[in-house]
Amino acid sequence: METYVAALDQGTTSSRAILFNRAGEIVARAQYPFRQIYPQPGWVEHDPMEIWATEKRALAEAVDSAHIDPKRIAAVGITNQRETTILWDRATGQPVYNAIVWQCRRTAPICDRLAADGLGETVTDKTGLLIDAYFSGTKIKWLLDNVPGVRERAERGELCAGTVDSWLIWQLTGGCVHVTDYSNASRTMLFNIHTLQWDEDLCHALGIPMQLLPEPRPNSEPYGVIAENIPGLEALAGIPICGSAGDQPAALFGQACFTPGQAKNTYGTGCFTLMNVGAEPVRSKAGLVTSVGWSVNGRTTYALEGSVFNAGSTIQWLRDELGLIGTAPECDRLAESVPDAGGVYIVPAFTGLGAPYWDMYARGTIVGLTRVTTKAHIARAVLDAIAFQVTDLVRAMNDDAPCPLTTLRVDGGASVSDILMQTQADLLRLPVDRPAQVETTAFGAAALAGLATGVWGSMEELERLRLSQHVFLPRRDEAACAVDYAQWRRAVKRSRSWIENEL
């Protein structure tokens, strides 16, 4: 009898549920978008109740459309947008404020004060991160300091804090389980990646009561079961929740990057390059960060990571704000209609620059416009910008890693773009390997849950499931690529520190 694993893939713009069989094949899926809330420039929020409602609806629909007996679902795994932060009432399960999203830059002044206080080295030594508004710690502090009554309620033990994994597990278990996994915890700026515990000194420095925080747990073990009487999920009551990982380490796991030195890039709302660095964390000297990749069977694997904030979101900007395209695939068609971007460079620093620059005050820039620039050139420049940013990350990674990268595995929505993948291979001078199963993030969560319940017996078995769909090899002249990349770096300089004096 076939056995299935359900993965909840809670992303920045939509909530998805995917059902996998033992061969790693997709049996059913469902997806629902939710609102993006922008209260002020540089601020990004989500409604936590919309996150829960859309994820619950997606799970129910995926199971229903599969036409299977829900009792054949062995486990549920969760993967999620990381760093996005929620505070909620422990008794009612109601959020006290909207979720503050990973892209939100409202806490940049808090980060500046922490850096001025000399906390930077301590943060890096203990957490593997840099002080930046990207991470959850300053988001929790902002909520405590700015939402009336929240600090007092937190100190009385009435509230819970967590990233989206914690929120979903809490809701799925009917408020019985308040946990997070090591990979999500390691993105808070509060978690010691050496001891795998919340760091008391860092919590004190940020004024965060430790009783707010969820219990950190390994990535592949039982956390709880789906509660009875959840509207729409009654048939799933009792199914164990056994796997959890942030979206990027889940993709690294789903890509079967189990050997140190293997790396992947996910082309989603942002771009995220992760390399497996093995059992010991690597301290970056090139503007990258180190996080927990996963902890399975008592063994913790660390990942070196570079993150850029705007990739697929730049294509959405072309569609939704500029109206230059009607659908995302039109960006490819436009870009393919011209041989290059015509000297146009776009730096999509809409919410600052991530790795390796870490500039909270950078803003988006378009340079090189002339009267002959067309919307096709703009579309090509958008795809180029995504590839340039990943090139920045891989170059930094090669500076830090014990040995240079030899192949980049890719996934995420924009990885279906042949023109983008070819541009990426040209700029990196490396093979770019696109898998047959592009839903690697969701499969990573399913794999972690399936390992915990015996659906898959080993990581070697999971590795055999990964197949390549296409490998892109460098084709363009190397010297021309080098000139293009140098121009990109010039454009980046023009975007730096753009609004520093305005905050």
Question: What is each stretch, according to the model?
Answer:
Residues 1-97, 125, 231-240, 428-432, ...:
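N-terminal glycine/serine-rich phosphate-binding loop of ATP-dependent small-molecule kinases
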Residues 206-221:
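A conserved helix-loop-beta module that forms one wall/lid of the active-site cleft
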